Structures are given as structure tokens and as C-alpha cells.
């Protein structure tokens, strides 16, 4: 499929900006889910072409990224940090003055939970509650599709599984090895109208593409959910997932070293609907994250122009011409 991008723009994504600013070396995470790869690609392009930074992308996941910041003070920037999944380890870093949240990278935020296909919910409405699922495990193919290791949602879901004694009800927990296999398991089931039960979050291509129904886990209990964010906690409980703040976080050293870039990152916010539409374009066009970043920058100057200072805006506009 023809990509709606230019060769020059894609080359610019892989080449640091000219020596046009005082920004030095910067490290930024890239998590292994679609929206985050787009956020990272957009931020990288702006930092390099608008601010002259030399950007290193660090492949990571939520928990390893927080651990790395705690132990090494790097990477400088953690993009798309899902606060509900980051756990107490991240909050301790804030208390210690090592990191600072700059702002919401998704507005109003994300949604996460345990889901079944809507066609399954319509056929078996009892499956819309966790009690109904556990009473009828065969209707969900006796399987729960869990997050990969290293994801914050894996910790929370593991604790929920223990608190519910889910496996005792006859449901096997399948721990996916990657976000790609988790997504493909949903896609394969929905396309064949087969049962599927598992964790997912949005904005994502699958939740935008497929009609899914959230399984009710009960009331949201802040203290229980906070406890469940700690791996292998002694007293896990059952709580619904709350609305999810999704942030950009930086080390305090980076904010002091590169205040203008930090200011830009504090304004770098995607409307959740905009991100969903961008991911849908990315999927339909079979595009890479870099190509999606180019597509966004070429078609949404009214959004990103307010993120940058005057000099950076002028530099970036000249690249996009």
C-alpha cells in the first residue's frame, strides 16, 4: 500500500537536527505498543529537528523503565507512562525528587480492563460480570489472555487473578510474550466470532477496530488497586481498573539541563480521539510509527505548533515544507 509520506521527511526522522540549538544528548523510552511508538517518534522528530537534540531511543516497558531511572537516572524521558500501572516504585521516585511528571500525553487519558467480544456478551449477558465468567468458564474457552511480563498491567492482573482465585474456576491464564501476540489473539478470535477473554487497553487499534465489552470486576477501590500495583503483594484484592492518567515523565536532572525541551514535552498532548484515528490510519496504511509521526505532523500543525517555542516552530516548519 502506498505510504502518504515523503522520503525527505522519513530521512529527517533518522538524522539529528543541525547544530541549531544548545540541546545535547537525550534518551527517551519506546514501549512496545502502538500508541507509544507514535508518541516517541513524534517527540524524537521535534526534539531533533526543532531543538537540535541528539536523541537515543531506549526500547523498554513500564516497570523496567521505572527501575532503570531509579538505579541509573536514565532514560531522561519516559513517554506514555500509565500511572495506574507504574505502581509505588514510580511514586517513590517522585517523593525522592528524582523524577517529575510534566503533563498528560493522552487527554483525557486511557481506559483499561478485562474484556470480551460484544457478540459474546449479547449471546451470554451473564459474562458481563466476573462472577458470570467464573461460573461459566467454558463460554470464554477456559482461558484468560494476560499481559506480557514487564508491563504494569501484568502485575495488577496477576494480583487480581490471585484475589479472585480465577484458575480454580477452570480458567487457564495464558501469559502472552508480547503485545503483538496479545493483540493478534483478540483479532483472530473476533474475526472468527470465537470466545475471547483478557486484558486490553485503549486507545489502541484493536479496541478501535473491534466491538468489545468490558467485564465488570466490581467497584473501584483506590486502596486495593494501589496494593495490586505491587508485584506478589501479600494481600491482593478485587478492584475495578480506574480511569487511567497517561503521562510524560522526566528526570529532574533532565528538566534542569534542558528546560526548553521539558517545556515542550509538558505541552505535548494528544487527544485520545486523535490518537485513535492516527492508529487506525497506521493500521489501514500498514505504516510504521515513523510514517505515522510524519502523517500527524503534516496534518495537524494546529495542534503541535502550540507545543513549541518560536525558534523551534520555525525550524520544524521549514523541514515540513
Language model region names:
Residues 1-20:
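Gram-negative bacterial Sec-dependent N-terminal signal peptides
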Residues 22-35, 53-58, 141-145, 265:
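Short, well-ordered beta-strand elements
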Residues 35, 162-169, 176-193, 198-199, ...:
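An extracytoplasmic/periplasmic, membrane-proximal ligand-sensing/linker region
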Residues 43-52, 137-172:
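Ligand-binding cleft/hinge of the Venus flytrap
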Residues 67-69, 75-79, 153-230:
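Ligand-binding pocket segment of bilobal, Venus flytrap-like solute-binding proteins
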Residues 99-150:
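A conserved helix-loop-strand patch within extracytoplasmic ligand-binding domains
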Residues 112-122, 245-257, 280-281:
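A bilobed periplasmic-binding-protein/Venus flytrap-type ligand-binding module shared by bacterial periplasmic
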Residues 206-269:
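C-terminal lobe and pocket-closing loops
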